[in-house]
């Protein structure tokens, strides 16, 4: 196995994450060790992720997945695992063809772990999901990033406002962003950044350039 570009980093006794890579492009993968299941937030696209997950899950627990959105770097390994359940948005389901569609907030208790899975309005990808763990960490995938439109990175102004409103209700103080180092950014900094972008909107313009 060549996983020299991958690291498994521990956040606390229950939660770890696998670092992202550029070649192949692969998102961060979050691993939550519940009482009955191991939970994966995104499954990545790097071929060595499966072996790292197997090592993490030495007890052989069933595995559930929560997919942030449908881009390949987040779901590329979906067929490499035998999941008990897969939670995703409607557009992601069109790409995976397996699991459940989540369109409203759900709360799950798995031993000492409490998960909050919820739809996240996002310019980057419609139908995104986020996952909050123990009101401590909130995993956002690429949810706060811009989208590509006519060769420019832009935000949909309406979706951005909705996203800010949703993120303000999250109790966790630590927001975790894929492809970003450090992985953790304080909630207040993320929201301040998004509010600054929203503040640049022009009247009657649907999109805001990401400068």
For each of these PLM feature ranges, what is it?
Residues 4-54, 129-145:
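Conserved beta-strand hairpin/beta-sheet module of binuclear metal-dependent hydrolase folds
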Residues 35-36, 58-62, 79-85, 133-136, ...:
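Short glycine/proline-enriched coil/turn segments at helix->beta-strand junctions
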Residues 38-40, 114-116, 121-200, 205-207:
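Metallo-beta-lactamase
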């Amino acid at each position: 196995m060549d996983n020299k570009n991958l690291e498994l980093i521990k956040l606390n006794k229950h939660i770890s994450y696998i670092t992202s890579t550029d070649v192949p492009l692969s998102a961060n993968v979050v691993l939550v060790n519940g009482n009955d299941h191991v939970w994966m937030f995104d499954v990545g696209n790097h071929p060595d992720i499966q072996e790292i997950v197997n090592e993490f899950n030495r007890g052989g627990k069933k595995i559930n997945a929560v997919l942030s959105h449908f881009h390949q770097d987040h779901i590329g390994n979906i067929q490499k695992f035998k999941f008990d359940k897969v939670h995703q948005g409607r557009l992601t389901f069109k790409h995976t063809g397996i699991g459940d569609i989540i369109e409203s907030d759900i709360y799950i208790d798995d031993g000492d772990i409490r998960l909050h899975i919820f739809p996240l309005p996002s310019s980057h990808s419609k139908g995104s999901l986020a996952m909050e763990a123990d009101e401590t960490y909130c995993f956002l995938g690429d949810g706060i990033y811009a989208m590509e439109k006519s060769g420019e990175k832009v935000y949909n102004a309406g979706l951005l406002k909705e996203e800010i409103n949703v993120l303000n209700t999250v109790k966790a103080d630590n927001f975790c962003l894929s492809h970003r180092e450090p992985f953790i950014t304080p909630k207040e900094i993320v929201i301040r950044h998004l509010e600054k972008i929203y503040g640049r909107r022009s009247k009657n313009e649907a999109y805001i350039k990401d400068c």
